[in-house]
Amino acid sequence: VQGPEARELAAPCIDESHREQALQLKPFTGMDSSQSFVARTGYTGEDGFEIMLPAAVAPSVWDRLLAAGVAPCGLGARDTLRLEAAMNLYGTDMDESISPLEAGLGWTVAWEPADRDFIGRGPMETLRDDPGKRRFVGLLLEDKGVLRNHQRVVVEGKADGEITSGGFSPTIGRSIALARVAAGDYDSAQVDVRGKLLNVRIVKPPFVRNGKTRIEL
């Protein structure tokens, strides 16, 4: 259950003895109740709850959420939200062959203390210090059209990258994408859309967070 009113609307569906505790949860924390696990987490860039509960009681909780005014949404809506929030999709934006440093996830690597050892530290340090490593960036389409996965990103006439996730952003009213591109100091590029080069601006993701645009249009 995600969105600005998610916790308020979902709270009545949580066991009364644990309801207040659930409402006090900090982001990225969770709690056990008598029949469920409630976490203040999500994959949308919005605030809210993720609730795990026995299958036998799920239909009644669903009905109560509907009665409270929660609107159902499908996978397409969820995927649009996570794209606006620039949240990686495994198998699309990253996999085992992609370093966190080339997936916009460098902040997850704990380099300190300097003697902290972990599997892959050596190669990752080499990549960290490599000025030629690929960049993981956001793209904002300046022309008419829609950006899609696997379209080629072209810089100065050369195919120098690929869109990993793309689509239309209802919040921004433009097409957006995540892409892995070649190193370099440039803030614009083109994308090959069915043989036609369309202009894009390179921006720092996320595009949207908590329903508010984070980039300059």
Where are these regions (language model features)?
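Conserved, structured C-terminal
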Residues: 1-217
